[in-house]
Amino acid sequence: MRKALVCGAGGFIGGHLIKKLKREGYWVRGVDIKMHEYAPTQADEFLLLDLREPHHCWRALSLGRGETFDEVYQLAADMGGMGFIHTAECEIMHNSALINIHMIDTAARMGVPRYFFSSSVCVYRDMEPGEPALTEADAVPANPDNEYGWEKLYAERMAQAYARHYPLQVRMARFENCYGPEGTWRGGREKAPAALCRKVAEAEAGSHIEVWGDGTAIRNFTYVDDMVEGIYRLTHSDLEGAVNLGGDEYVTVAELAQLVIAVSGKRLGIRYVEGPVGVRSRNFSKDRSRLLDWEARVPLREGIARTYSWVEAQVRQAQRG
């Protein structure tokens, strides 16, 4: 039986990835600093470890009897939504850098043959609406919009260096705004889709929700089931170097907010307020991800409807105490 280690197993994408690996017949060990908050883990074994510590990385990767994991999926990071990314720059760079430094080094030294690293399209520069799609090579010369992107770019380069000097196959995906049920929806670390779903679920009919910025920023969003399928296919492919992983459905933040309101069935207004908004526009080439025979299949409206239903249930449960 193939064995996989999922780092960041207590997080949103990590929890869904474990489900995918179990369906594929793996024995899975999950590792995180916390248990999953919204769903029981399906991992065969779950270890509470702090991967900023080198000896915890050794513990995570140790199977005994000279065995190594067939695959390691490194999704552990200190991250959150736009507000968190702009206010916790030091924590993000410090914590995530330590995790990535120690995990890739330990995996390489222990003879792990295949290693997946979760990067982000935050490695790219800001864009103007209407610009041609950015390819993976356009990340250099580098000019990320935030420190989260700089740390991801550094971690990519580090992983590639280890792949050159050890018998380690590295695969890297640049995630494009993953969303869906069973993810953080309150507390400041939530991403835009979950935050909007929460605001709409909490709002009284006839009132309004607040949205940061003027609503014109352009984004694309990728449903979590599509993302984990892309991760799995990329990890088992021959594609070296980073791969943009996301859908082709681009919307403004205003359109996203209106979509959430529409699926809720409520009559609500939108009030735009000052707040961190990130880059103005996004548009990424999908040429390399198409080599995986992969594309995002869940339409945005369907994915938002599923996500809103789940977030609304969480809001109602929290209100009941």
Put a short name on every predicted segment.
Residues 119-120, 156-184, 205, 210:
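Conserved beta-loop-beta element that borders a ligand/cofactor-binding pocket
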